[in-house]
Amino acid sequence: MSRKCELTGVGVLYGNNVSHSQRKTRRRFEPNLRSVKFISDITTAEYRLSVSARCISSVEKAGGFDAYMLKANNDALSTTAKAIKKKIIQTKMAKSL
């Protein structure tokens, strides 16, 4: 399992621990990932995704999972999230006809 958010694309960053004496040792900054179940109002389906804690609040701020997915940039989404977005758009179009 990769340490990457499926909705925002936030991944592992690398840097240094710096002590008081300025010695530098390499370290990894890992994202705070959570496995979350999102429920789509449009498709009435549940989707389990590995997302960062910051992304969870972004989804809530956007007005829910469907609103976030419709606004989301495809470049940041994982292949699973792209398929979910496509399914949401298709279902929304079918319901509007």
From Swiss-Prot:
Report whether Membrane shows up as a keyword of the record.
Answer: no
Pfam families membership: Ribosomal_L28
Which Gene Ontology BP annotations are present? translation
Swiss-Prot/TrEMBL keywords: Ribonucleoprotein, Ribosomal protein
State any single GO MF term. Answer: structural constituent of ribosome
Is this entry keyworded Nucleotidyltransferase?
no
Cellular component, GO, one term: cytosolic large ribosomal subunit
What the entry lists under SUPFAM superfamilies is as follows: L28p-like (SSF143800)
The family database entries (HAMAP family) matched by this protein are listed as:
Ribosomal_bL28
Please give the family membership noted in the entry. Belongs to the bacterial ribosomal protein bL28 family.
UniProt name for this protein: Large ribosomal subunit protein bL28
- Organism, as annotated: Rickettsia bellii (strain OSU 85-389)
